Amino acid sequence: MSHLDPTLLVLLVLAALGIISHNMTVTLAMLLLLVIRITPLNHFFPWVEKYGLTIGVLILTVGVMAPIASGKITVQAVLNSFMNWKSLLAIVIGVLVSWLGSRGVSLMSNQPSTVAGLLVGTVLGVALFKGVPVGPLIAAGILSLLIGKS
């Protein structure tokens, strides 16, 4: 019997979770990683590991800002939002989340043993609860508060 790569098995299980939960994002991400792993493209993994998060945040930011850039949300509407208590609360929460994310990056860099749990938790949250895969950095930031590390 040939040796089965456990990493491939993990990617397949996570892709299956994506299919079962009808979460195309998880499914496509896992299948893309699977293709990269089993083809000569696997030599790009260091690049993906180094820049993937930055590229993902860039794409997410473009998607979030597109309505402003296209004019669908006007400058006046943006300015008016600062007069609303919900928008002001959103600003405060945005600052808090950014701070948590920075703590998360630090924790993930200094304690790589936490990364696997954070990633599995995030993928499960995305696959099973229709979450959005922006959680690892924030989750790591919250974890850093709970375990007292930065």
Curated annotation (Swiss-Prot):
Annotated TM spans: 8-28, 51-71, 88-108, 123-143
CC terms in the record's Gene Ontology section: plasma membrane
Subcellular location: Cell membrane
UniProt keyword terms in alphabetical order: Cell membrane, Membrane, Transmembrane, Transmembrane helix
Family label: Belongs to the UPF0756 family.
Membrane topology (UniProt): Multi-pass membrane protein
Official protein name in the record: UPF0756 membrane protein plu2726
